[in-house]
Swiss-Prot record:
One of its GO terms (molecular function) is S-adenosylmethionine:tRNA ribosyltransferase-isomerase activity. It catalyses: 7-aminomethyl-7-carbaguanosine(34) in tRNA + S-adenosyl-L-methionine = epoxyqueuosine(34) in tRNA + adenine + L-methionine + 2 H(+). This is S-adenosylmethionine:tRNA ribosyltransferase-isomerase. One of its GO terms (cellular component) is cytoplasm. Its main location: cytoplasm. It comes from Paraburkholderia phytofirmans (strain DSM 17436 / LMG 22146 / PsJN). Keywords: Cytoplasm, Queuosine biosynthesis, S-adenosyl-L-methionine, Transferase. Transfers and isomerizes the ribose moiety from AdoMet to the 7-aminomethyl group of 7-deazaguanine (preQ1-tRNA) to give epoxyqueuosine (oQ-tRNA). Belongs to the QueA family. The keyword S-adenosyl-L-methionine applies. SUPFAM superfamilies: QueA-like. Pathway: tRNA modification; tRNA-queuosine biosynthesis.
Length: 352
């Protein structure tokens, strides 16, 4: 049985990308081509991300996550004058949101907090591990006007105007995430146009990435880990495109682990209900580890993930544990850039 320690590796800190490259598609792409069937080593091909159209067949379907990152981080003050840090996790209504709150002493329901020295919110009920916050006006408007972009904890600079552009995908449409679907950051309009010209199909879903994506796994036995929950919407048009892709013998390619989680969660629920994949708008806490049976995704575009993370477990389940170990060894030797602003992989499902 695999344990948390099986997903650890040593990463030189200088390989953690701190800034985005000047051009989105100038990042590197490590193509990991698993052989047909389960046997044999994968072929590793060093590329540039701009070469992605060469790796994809006409008629294949790319599935993107069109979530948009909120300016969800605030510094504030309690009525007592104590400093507080707030990270909005999820919008729950026009004037309400769930948030993480860091303070020397937990705020009590009914108390007010001043955010960004601009407006007051009222603390409502506790919804573990979050607090309900009541805003004085439309919370999305206030968040976008006064909040700060919530860069990941391993990025060591304060967000600037470059981050406000580059920590969003060019196809971001639906505000609600507190972290970017980072595989999508490599796509620019010119690359999307080249994919269209080749006859590659495109479709979108929405999964609002939560702060839980950065939470470490704290138990050695993976079965004891409680996965965070995230909301997603899979439109019927995407379900229809997937069925058509399957019917003509083409492959479904998830852009990012967030797209993967939404697709596989919807397919698993559909299978359990004895029906074909269809539109879905719901929560998922799907935890994909080696041994999981993939139902939809044939290939995956994804960045390089943190040691001991649930996303490293996901890609290991998808491409094979040994394949991912060899891929990461190669990436470190070849000085690929890691994490959100880093380079990418194109993985093929091990049994595909």
């Amino acid at each position: 049985m695999l344990t948390l320690s099986d997903f650890d590796f040593d990463l030189p800190p200088e390989l953690i990308a701190q800034v985005a490259l000047p051009e989105r598609s100038a990042s590197r792409l490590l193509e990991v081509d698993n052989p047909a069937g389960a046997a044999g080593p994968a072929r590793l091909i060093d590329r540039r991300f701009a070469e992605l159209p060469e790796c994809i067949a006409p008629g294949d379907l790319l599935v993107f996550n069109d979530t948009k990152v909120l300016k969800a981080r605030f510094l504030g003050q309690k009525a007592s004058g104590g400093k507080i840090e707030v990270l909005v996790e999820r919008l729950t209504g026009e004037r309400t949101a769930l948030a993480q709150i860091r303070a020397s002493k937990s705020p009590q329901p009914g108390t007010t907090i001043r955010l960004a020295d601009a407006f007051d919110v009222t603390v409502g009920e506790r919804v573990e591990p979050f607090y309900t916050l009541h805003f004085p006006d439309d919370c999305l408007t206030l968040i976008e006007q006064f909040g700060r972009l919530p860069l990941p904890p391993y990025i060591e600079h304060d967000p600037d105007s470059t981050d406000e552009t580059r920590y969003q995908t060019v196809f971001a449409q639906n505000p609600g995430a507190v972290a970017a679907p980072t595989a999508g950051l490599h796509f620019d309009d010119a690359l999307l146009a080249r994919l269209d010209e080749k006859g590659v199909e495109r479709a979108t879903l929405t999964l609002h990435v939560g702060a839980g994506t950065f939470q470490p796994v704290r138990v050695e036995n993976l079965a004891e880990h409680k996965m965070h929950s995230e909301w997603y919407h899979l439109p019927q048009a995407l379900a229809d495109k997937i069925a058509a892709t399957r019917a003509r013998g083409n492959r479904v390619i998830a852009v990012g682990t967030t797209s993967m989680r939404a697709l596989e969660a919807a397919a698993r629920d559909a299978e359990a209900a004895g029906r074909p994949l269809a539109a879905a708008s719901t929560e998922t806490d799907i935890f994909i580890t080696p041994g999981y049976k993939f139902r939809v995704v044939d290939r995956l575009v994804t960045n390089f993930h943190l040691p001991k993370s649930t996303l490293l477990m996901l890609v290991s389940a998808f491409a094979g544990v040994e394949t991912i170990r060899e891929t990461y060894r190669h990436a470190i030797e070849q000085r690929y850039r890691f994490f959100s602003y880093g380079d990418a992989m194109l993985l093929t499902r091990r049994d595909a």
